[in-house]
């Protein structure tokens, strides 16, 4: 059974050109735990790509950072608010060291700064994760 309010399709950005297009003509905001780049899409899908450079550490550290960023993005982007945007989330050296709650706040604030969500929504307290 289909839901009336279905979530838009999440599309992974995989090709280098997609990343370069967003970097060249999108908006960018730097936070201590991550860098977020966003660009409006033609369709109503949500594009998401992750990248972590070798500056962050060895392969284990880079993969851990990408895993944390993937979970963070999947939680934050699960509603319809972000349909029609592509995002590139870039991991930084602090991504692995930063507590998850602060990393999550960084992501929400970056979404507000690039203009994807209103600043009022980002100012609301972020619900605690249930353990």
What are the residue ranges of the model-derived segments?
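Positively charged, solvent-exposed patches that mediate nucleic-acid binding
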Residues: 1-131
């Amino acid at each position: 059974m289909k839901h009336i309010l279905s979530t838009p399709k999440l599309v992974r950005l995989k090709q280098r050109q997609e990343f370069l297009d967003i970097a060249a003509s999108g908006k960018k905001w730097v936070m201590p735990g991550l860098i977020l780049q966003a660009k409006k899409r033609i369709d109503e899908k949500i594009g998401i790509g992750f990248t972590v450079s070798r500056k962050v550490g060895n392969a284990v550290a880079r993969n851990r950072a990408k895993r944390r960023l993937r979970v963070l993005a999947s939680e934050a982007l699960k509603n319809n608010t972000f349909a029609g945007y592509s995002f590139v989330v870039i991991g930084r050296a602090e991504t692995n060291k930063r507590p998850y709650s602060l990393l999550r706040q960084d992501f929400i604030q970056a979404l507000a700064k690039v203009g994807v969500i209103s600043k009022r929504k980002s100012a609301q307290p972020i619900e605690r994760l249930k353990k």
